[in-house]
């Protein structure tokens, strides 16, 4: 079975968040799954390769817009061209601050970088459009198992 839209996931949390290992895991730890999703999707002729992003991060209200952009860039260079935001929670207006929040970067007007969020979404949309309307070229193959799997 081949999905209409292959999807990966960025699970970014690490038990080593207070060490240099966290920096490596944050950028590379699960990107192998993006490559698998993208490669399979491209072999099947799919134009859209999706990824649920910012699934689990340093914690609610602890993820900067700079980190979000950096992870987004890593997704694009590993073949992802469609972003699904994790953590865009619905919270009723009458709910006390900060609202109903659980996991992920928490995309909401309650976040301090919310006034600047449109700049990132515009950037993401432009790159998504370009990559969805271009032809992927890969000069390498990834053979399992790898250290990440």
Regions found by a protein language model. Name each.
Residues 1-6, 11-149:
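Carbohydrate-binding surfaces of carbohydrate-active enzymes
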């Amino acid at each position: 079975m081949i999905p209409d839209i292959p999807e990966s996931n960025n699970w970014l949390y690490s038990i080593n968040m207070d060490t240099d290992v966290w920096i490596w895991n944050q950028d590379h730890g699960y990107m192998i799954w993006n490559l698998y999703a993208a490669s399979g999707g491209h072999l099947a002729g799919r134009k859209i390769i999706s990824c649920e992003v910012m699934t689990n991060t340093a914690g609610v209200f602890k993820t900067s817009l700079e980190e979000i952009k950096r992870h987004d860039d890593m997704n694009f260079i590993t073949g992802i061209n469609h972003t699904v935001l994790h953590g865009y929670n619905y919270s009723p207006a009458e709910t006390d601050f900060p609202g109903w929040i659980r996991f992920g970067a928490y995309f909401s007007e309650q976040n301090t970088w919310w006034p600047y969020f449109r700049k990132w979404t515009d950037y993401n949309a432009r790159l998504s459009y370009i990559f969805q309307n271009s032809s992927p070229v890969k000069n390498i193959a990834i053979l399992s198992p790898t250290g990440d799997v």
